[in-house]
Amino acid sequence: MSGDEAVAAPVVPPVAEAAVIPEDMDVSTALELTVRKSRAYGGVVRGLHESAKLIEKRNAQLCVLAEDCNQPDYVKLVKALCADHSIKLLTVPSAKTLGEWAGLCKIDSEGNARKVVGCSCLVIKDFGEETTALNIVKKHLDSN
């Protein structure tokens, strides 16, 4: 190899996510993608005890609460902590849905979630990388 040859920089393929995620996505789908991406980066905490500790430390960026939680004191505590510490709070209709997003399930060979365990509350401490879905969630939070 002579010194006159230039070394070619490796070609990085464009991120496939930009082509997959439409700009007019609804907030629920955007929240699901945001939770899954945060989980991949280790930024999701599940359960009342861990969520309350993270909110108290003011390390939480977003709290997601299931509407069908059957413990009124649980809901009251999470809402009060989020209000006291200025943490944004979103709700989802089902604890099973939130549990699936949080990874509390088994994935079968076809990619479908099986044996989903309900999750009443989760807190995101690290969003990971900036995505279109995250921007949609942030716009929704800012508008409310």
Curated annotation (Swiss-Prot):
GO terms for cellular component: cytosolic ribosome; cytosolic small ribosomal subunit; nucleus; peroxisome. GO terms for molecular function: structural constituent of ribosome. Keywords: Acetylation, Ribonucleoprotein, Ribosomal protein. The modification N-acetylserine is found at residue 2. GO terms for biological process: translation. It comes from the Eukaryota. Belongs to the eukaryotic ribosomal protein eS12 family. This is Small ribosomal subunit protein eS12y.
